[in-house]
Design a protein with these regions (language model features):
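Noncatalytic, helix-rich "gating/capping" subdomain that lines the substrate-entry/channel surface
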Residues: 1-226
Length: 226
């Protein structure tokens, strides 16, 4: 899979790669899940929500204070180390480019308060209507069909953020899109990859962000996978 991400040679193949990654549980430009339709509780519907960032909150990209600045510095260093562990060159510069992309995305994301507002977040669209959230790089109807041919309508939690993210990704260089996908893949699959990758992923997300000093012992992690 990692070789497939590295081999992407045009933006035309990006949408399909995003769908394939999502099916593997790897975070992409948007999140999605199947849940109850709040206005028709007997129905289930696919919901799309804003995504595209590696830090868990938009404020971590945007707030100007020492704590957030420290997190941003640590995050870029983490991305650089992950790229280097994947055998990639120029990790620092490429990590900075991914950080710049994600900062642009954070600027169009909804605040935590708005994103959790059930009324603002209920926006239903037919499959055909989701074309308005597409860009030349991301074909939303095609992606939804690839996720499931049964999808005929969806809820989009933060429409302006989803469209804004699609537009930002369309303007981004292919190399940056690939690097971001590679990094999301390394993080999402970290526990199946060499310990050096898993340890680095935990050092940032577990220790730096959450304060957990160390990973569980190997036997405990193994039990968790059974």
């Amino acid at each position: 899979w990692l070789d497939k991400v590295k081999a992407l040679d045009s933006k035309a193949g990006y949408s399909a790669l995003v769908v394939e990654a999502a099916k593997m549980g790897i975070n992409g430009p948007f999140g999605g899940y199947v849940g109850q339709d709040d206005k028709k509780p007997t129905n289930y519907i696919f919901t799309i929500y804003q995504g595209g960032t590696g830090l868990p909150d938009r404020d971590m990209y945007l707030l100007d204070n020492p704590k957030m600045a420290s997190i941003r510095t640590a995050y870029v260093a983490h991305l650089a180390r992950m790229l280097e562990l994947a055998g990639e060159d120029n990790g620092a510069a490429r990590a900075a480019a991914v950080m710049d992309l994600e900062t642009q995305i954070a600027k169009v994301q909804w605040t935590r308060e708005d994103a959790s507002d059930a009324v603002k977040g209920y926006n239903k669209f037919t499959l055909a209507q989701t074309a308005q959230f597409s860009s030349p790089t991301l074909d939303m109807p095609a992606m939804l069909k690839a996720i499931s041919p049964k999808i005929t309508e969806v809820l989009i939690g933060q429409p302006s953020a989803v469209k804004g993210t699609a537009d930002i990704l369309d303007k981004a260089p292919l190399g940056v899109l690939k690097d971001q996908m590679l990094l999301r893949s390394l993080g999402g699959l970290a526990n199946y990859l060499p310990d050096s990758v898993a340890d680095e992923n935990f050092a940032f997300y577990g220790t730096t962000l959450q304060g957990t000093p160390q990973r569980e012992e190997r036997w405990k992690r193994a039990v968790g996978f059974t």
